[in-house]
Curated annotation (Swiss-Prot):
One of its GO terms (cellular component) is cytosol. It is an enzyme of class 6 (ligase). Catalyzes the attachment of glutamate to tRNA(Glu) in a two-step reaction: glutamate is first activated by ATP to form Glu-AMP and then transferred to the acceptor end of tRNA(Glu). This is Glutamate--tRNA ligase 1. It is found in: Cytoplasm.
Amino acid sequence: MSVVTRFAPSPTGMLHIGGARTALFNYLFARRNGGRFLLRIEDTDRERSTQEATDAILDAMEWLGLTPDEPPVMQSAQVDRHAAVAHDMVARGTAFRCYVTPEELQARRDLGEEKRQAAKQEGISDAEKEALLAEASQLLAPFRSPYRDGASPPSPDAPFTVRLRAPESGPRTVEDGVQGTVTIDASEIDDLVMLRADGTPTYMLAVVVDDHDMGITHVIRGDDHLRNTFRQVPIYEAMGWSVPNFSHVPMIHGNDGAKLSKRHGALSTTAYRDMGYLPEAMKAYLLRLGWSHGDQEIFTDEEAVQVFDVSGINKAPARLDLDKLATVNAHFMRLAADERLFDLICPVLSKNCSLSDAEVARIRAALPHMKDRGSTLIELANAFAFLYAKRPLELNKNAVKALSDEGKLRLKGLYDDLQRMSQWSGASISETIKSYCAATGLSMGQIGPPLRAALTGGLPAPDLAPVMDWLGREETLARIDDQLAG
């Protein structure tokens, strides 16, 4: 059997990180088993589905490199097929026309709740309470339609829905790749609506038909769909179709164990891109969010394909840890090719200011030595601020203190030696500074602070010799001269 997985988001909002993790798991499982990974956009909710959300989902998938093996399937394009299956099931006797109206169903639920509340009243006997709770339980139980047994319609032209004839009784079991053996009683399954009164298919029917028609062999999705599985399997059985293997993945919680919300960082996937995270880092982090393989913490794309299996997914909800994500991102930033990293930070740099060719050259020269200066692209881009700061530099409090009269006096002697240098390189600059210190009896602790203040204005920067090399002779001497003349 050739493995076929799918990711099936609804375009009612942006792709959040929980959905991105589900897509990743499906992608990796297909790749690990030499199968195909497909994408279906479940856009049957006409009121809430938008093209903007669809585009955002596709954009996020492209950014993560989770490319489907075939063009995306739009669920709304299959509505005629969905309806045909429902009518076929009616003909087979596994589905039926139901004439119960939404108003009647709501009245049933309201009456059930009314009786449940009445059972809480004081002054009623235990027998009355028991009777009320029994009636409430029956009214609020999964709905079994009176028309499932062939009751006549109220009128020849009465509107109807098409409902699944749910299994009568007995245990219903699903062997889940993550949750293990899960069993419920058939009485917990309702006669679910497959076609609405206007003839449009419901989600429950559409998912099953599409998964069958797309040849899906393994369904990996959030565990909020676990109960749906027991409602969907009877549709497969009614049509005589093979039932796919199911694996239901626990939800992602916040670092406090509470349900994930925006306060935990539950942003759209592309928001993390805008925050300066690399796609390979995002995938590596999401992979370990609820999945493990030995003691290894970080996986490359290639390693993940080689070892991923649903058996490594934990049953307990994973906890989002943005500090861990930042650590993983910093790791992949250090591994990234210099030219790619430069291209990625350019948009961030351009937001700060317009860079001259000379400033761009400085950043290119410094980049290989400064990859560890941030855990996101934004932090890294900001770390280069000292290279494109405009003269005369604005000094922070510590820089002003370092450039006291005594500090400037020490700096003046070094400035004269730097002017006399015939070759400008990190090594020659370092040697000149050492020679100056030896000749004057000063230590680096005495000359370093005023020199750093003059070159960076107090902004964070690496060792001084490479900084002066990246700035170049002209800019270095000009920055020092600005402070000596000030």
